[in-house]
């Protein structure tokens, strides 16, 4: 799928917002620190109650426990200029098509050029699991991932602010 880098008819949000697919996100504390330093609003979306810092820039959004409810909420709320943090490839694809920047919790950016192969690989792995093949999960989260994420989030916010 070829996704546009921006949506020309919709102006980007300025300043950008950060939307977080938060249920299994290992970098929430880092997101809060960066957001407060840069004065950027954050929406922390989950299907369970999560603790978030009490600050006007940080909003907790608790959705129903229905399958993909958090993903659906984020996909409907996101727009050009926003930055989304998620490990969910299908949500990343939806957010990219809405004109947002998307990065994974390890700092890997999802782009219009990379999302197609990520979706295809996800489908292959799902087929292998259904077929009973034992495949490993993601690599353990490391301190280097945290550093890479912080750098990627800063870069995404700088780019979003320039749009």
Regions found by a protein language model. Name each.
Residues 2-163:
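Nuclease catalytic cores that cleave nucleic-acid phosphodiester bonds
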């Amino acid at each position: 799928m070829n996704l546009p880098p921006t949506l020309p008819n919709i102006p980007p949000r300025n300043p950008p917002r950060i939307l977080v697919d938060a249920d299994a996100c290992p970098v929430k504390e880092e997101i809060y620190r960066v957001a407060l330093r840069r004065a950027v609003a954050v929406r922390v979306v989950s299907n369970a109650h999560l603790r978030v810092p009490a600050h006007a820039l940080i909003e907790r959004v608790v959705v129903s426990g229905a399958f993909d409810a958090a993903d659906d909420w984020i996909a409907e709320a996101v727009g050009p200029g926003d930055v989304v943090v998620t490990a969910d490839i299908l949500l990343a694809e939806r957010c990219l098509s809405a004109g947002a920047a998307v990065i994974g919790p390890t700092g890997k950016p999802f782009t219009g050029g990379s999302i197609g192969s990520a979706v295809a690989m996800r489908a292959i792995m799902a087929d292998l699991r259904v077929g009973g093949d034992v495949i490993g999960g993601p690599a353990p989260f490391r301190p280097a991932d945290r550093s890479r994420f912080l750098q990627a989030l800063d870069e995404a916010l700088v780019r979003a602010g320039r749009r």
